[in-house]
């Protein structure tokens, strides 16, 4: 039943992606047949320098997210705890750098131990993107500095990824991103997503998004994984949530998101957000539960 639902979800994403391309291409062809007037030419000529100057300006963004749960690629990284995630991004001429952290205010424990808040993660992302007509293309690098889940806990090894992304400036903005882990975990992660925004007025809009992923492991070692510490790659798991020496290779997780950005003043926006994450296959269900907090109810 889960595999059937996953197929329907992926088919829907694919159809929406193709629909977005079809809708934008048709108007583009019709516009090419229209003769260009002198007035239009003059307007374009004068607007281009202003647009170029606008694009040359450095950009910056600061944000703080308060979440009821930290879920990353389907994995439940926190449980019964509020997490705080500050983020800072700077950009210039297509280049950008982002620094993001995660503070777990009440680390999960199977016993009655009450751990104090713990800084569990700091991520650095460097990227470059460029637009070619309706096509957006980008490359990047991510360094995940991972901390122990609680005081006295075992610190997992840090992780590094490179990624390539392709997107279309069409309805639903279909985007495909391929991530490759190049340090300890040795896996590929492919993510296909669509999104759309409905602007109610200048201050309030509704943003909807959906994504589906595929995980391809290059390495699996059940003994190392069961020993803990974050080693052992991405193995496939049995229905009893036991690691095997088989590499995971299947559709992984889906995500549905809705947010309501509200612009309070010029530089301050509040965005209530709700997300629903779920496994796409039975293999993914076992793997996600075994690796996340759900394995320790």
Please place each PLM-identified region on the residue numbering.
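Glycine- and aromatic-enriched membrane insertion/assembly motifs of diderm outer-membrane
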Residues: 79-139, 143, 169-174
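Cleavable N-terminal export/targeting peptides
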Residues: 1-59
């Amino acid at each position: 039943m889960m595999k059937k639902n996953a197929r329907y979800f992926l088919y829907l994403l694919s159809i929406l992606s193709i629909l977005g391309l079809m809708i934008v291409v048709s108007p583009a062809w019709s516009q090419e047949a229209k003769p260009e007037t002198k007035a239009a030419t003059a307007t374009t000529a004068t607007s281009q320098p202003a647009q170029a100057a606008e694009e040359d300006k450095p950009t910056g963004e600061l944000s703080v997210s308060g979440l009821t749960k930290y879920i990353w690629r389907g994995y439940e990284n926190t449980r019964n705890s509020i997490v705080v995630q500050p983020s800072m991004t700077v950009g210039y001429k297509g280049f950008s750098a982002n620094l993001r952290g995660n503070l777990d205010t009440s680390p999960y424990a199977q016993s009655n131990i009450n751990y104090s808040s713990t800084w569990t993660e700091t991520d650095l992302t460097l990227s470059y993107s460029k637009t070619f007509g309706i096509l957006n293309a980008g490359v990047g690098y991510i360094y995940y500095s991972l901390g122990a889940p609680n005081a006295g806990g075992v610190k997992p090894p840090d992780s590094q990824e490179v990624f390539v992304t392709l997107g279309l400036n069409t309805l639903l903005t279909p985007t495909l991103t391929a991530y490759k882990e190049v340090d300890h975990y040795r896996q590929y992660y492919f993510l296909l997503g669509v999104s759309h925004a409905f602007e109610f007025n200048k201050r309030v809009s509704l943003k909807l998004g959906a994504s589906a992923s595929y995980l391809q492991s290059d390495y699996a070692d059940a003994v190392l994984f069961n020993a803990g510490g974050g080693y052992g790659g991405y193995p496939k798991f049995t229905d009893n949530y036991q690691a095997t020496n088989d590499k995971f290779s299947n559709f992984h997780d889906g995500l549905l998101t809705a947010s309501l950005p509200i612009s309070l003043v010029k530089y301050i926006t509040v965005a209530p957000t709700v997300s629903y994450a779920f496994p796409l296959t039975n293999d993914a269900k076992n793997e996600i539960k075994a690796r996340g907090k759900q394995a320790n109810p």
